[in-house]
Curated annotation (Swiss-Prot):
Keywords: Carbohydrate metabolism, Glycoprotein, Glycosidase, Hydrolase, Polysaccharide degradation, Secreted, Signal, Xylan degradation
Spans annotated as Disordered: 223-246
Thermal response of activity: Optimum temperature is 50 degrees Celsius.
Gene behind the chain: Xyn11B
Domain notes: The CBM1 domain assists the catalytic domain to bind to insoluble and crystalline polysaccharides and is thus required for enzyme activity on insoluble substrates.
Pathway: Glycan degradation; xylan degradation
Protein name: Endo-1,4-beta-xylanase 11B
Matching SUPFAM superfamilies: Cellulose-binding domain, Concanavalin A-like lectins/glucanases
Length: 291
């Protein structure tokens, strides 16, 4: 996705500005389909987007209806999921399993144009909070939890319009979960009240992302009623991929952090050593990782 943010300088460096191919005309796949390279399209009634920088070992599979599954490991960044194009102020229902080991998140993810904005409603993440280092603009109580609202800025980064500078809007759920209803109209209104302006909607998916990590997920996406807000849209000419400028953290566990785990960074109170065969490497001022 361009998936975590300028917030996270490490991913900005690690994730290249590769754009996945645009959706091909008539690309309607009605059977189980597995990808290991970037792709976008329509599958069994849902839009899908899958992006990888080519580094990790990742297998993304479109399954029946709104369901997809993914397994991943290794060095690099990827992001994928199912949803809609265009996005809208809809209520999104989803269920599934999500088992990350290290840097990862689960979120409703999308873009708007005019202005160009990348946005996230983060439902779950690894052991590194994607809002680390960002300025909190407020909060919203919806869908059984508080979500804190943030804005970050990316400069000369990959986007659905090529290499551009743009804002990122974030709602980060305090009580992490896997499954439930996400009222996007409520989040859009909260962002508007915080002075964050959205444009014409491009795609909107329930995304899983991994960055120098491993794990697996199976997510089933559904839709609900559409609320207010800008439902205009258009098909993105290319998916910049999930380049999460975000560096979610690893799992410390034990006396030393395991491979992919966090081992340092401003505000880190966990282990600063790494398991045998790995080295603690600084990604940015907020995050160091065992690689």
């Amino acid at each position: 996705m361009v998936a975590f943010s300028s917030l996270f300088l490490g991913a900005s460096i690690a994730a290249t500005a590769l754009a996945a191919p645009g959706e091909l005309p008539g690309m309607h796949l009605n059977k189980r389909q597995t990808y290991t390279q970037s792709a976008t399209g329509t599958h069994d009634g849902y839009y899908f987007s899958f992006w990888t920088d080519g580094g990790p070992n990742v297998r993304y599979t479109n399954e029946a209806g709104g369901q997809y599954s993914v397994t991943w490991s290794g060095n690099g960044n990827w992001v994928g999921g199912k949803g809609w194009n265009p996005g809208a102020a809809r209520t999104i229902n989803y269920t599934g399993t999500y088992q990350p080991n290290g840097n990862s998140y689960l979120a409703v993810y999308g873009w708007t144009r005019n202005p160009l904005v990348e946005y996230y409603v983060v439902e779950n993440f690894g052991t590194y909070d994607p809002s680390t280092g960002a300025q909190r603009l407020g909060s919203i109580n919806v869908d059984g939890s508080t979500y804190n609202v943030y804005r970050t800025r990316r400069t000369n980064a990959p986007s659905i319009e090529g290499t551009r500078s743009f804002d990122q809007y974030w709602s980060v759920r305090v009580n992490k979960r896997v499954g439930g209803s996400v009222d996007m109209n409520a989040h859009f209104n909260a962002w508007r009240q915080a002075g964050l302006t959205l444009g014409t909607h491009d795609y909107q998916i329930v995304a899983t992302e991994g960055y120098f990590s491993s794990g697996s997920a199976r997510i089933n996406v559904g839709g609900g009623s559409t609320g207010g807000g800008n439902n205009g849209g258009g098909n993105n000419g290319g998916n910049p991929g999930g380049n999460p400028g975000g560096n979610p953290g690893g799992n410390p566990g034990g006396n030393c952090s395991p491979r992919w785990g966090q081992c340092g960074g401003q505000g880190w109170n966990g282990p600063t050593c790494c398991e045998s065969g790995t080295t603690c490497r600084q990604q940015n001022q907020w995050y160091s990782q065992c690689l």
